[in-house]
Amino acid sequence: EFLAQDYDDIRMPVNALRFFVFNEKMKLELLAVPTFEGYKLPTDAENPWSVLPKNTALHLVWNEDGSSPKLHFSNKEYGGRLCFTLPGVDFSLAALHTWNKMPMISYRSSGNHMTVSPQYYRMGFFGGDISKPLGQFVLRGEAAFNVDKHFSYKPEAGAMEQKGFNTVNYLVGV
């Protein structure tokens, strides 16, 4: 398998509604995604990218039943972005109430097999970016704050209650 994405994967359609309001200095984009679609995870034991643990004594059973959020109005994803293009500086602010597309993997052993199930959790996102010309260079900065983002634990911790974490990512460059 190749590490680079195929062009078809990059241009994949998304079931979403987008609304724009803009003028020469400001743009507002609102987004609503009524359906959930998580990542397609490789679960075949022969696949080197498989998310299932290797060399286990128990037979592994992948079970996705009931793991995805149900198709309810309360489960939709929504967000917005407000961009400004002003003399000497561009900046934007964004927020998103979404589902983490990468599931937490839970492990439940019973008898001679272990059931492996994906679990999806809600998360929030707040972010912003800024661009400022400095002579022939442009100073650019971005920041993202993820609220209640869940990460996969070691398989031994799969039976424990999972909790979300708040994370901050940022980048500044010229």
Predicted regions and their residues:
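Outer-membrane beta-barrel translocator domains and adjoining extracellular loop/strand segments
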Residues: 41-47, 104-111, 151-158
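Outer membrane beta-barrel
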Residues: 1-49, 87
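Residues that define the transmembrane beta-barrel architecture of outer-membrane proteins
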Residues: 11-15, 22, 74-78, 122-126, ...
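Detector for outer-membrane/organellar transmembrane beta-barrel domains
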Residues: 96-98, 136-174
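Residues on the lipid-exposed face of transmembrane beta-strands in outer-membrane beta-barrel proteins
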Residues: 16-21, 80-84, 93, 128-132, ...
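Extracellular loop and loop/strand-boundary signature of outer-membrane beta-barrel proteins
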Residues: 2-5, 64-68, 112-116, 153-162
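Transmembrane beta-strands of outer-membrane beta-barrel pores
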Residues: 23-25, 32-38, 86, 95-101, ...
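Membrane-embedded beta-barrel scaffold of Gram-negative outer-membrane proteins
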Residues: 80-108
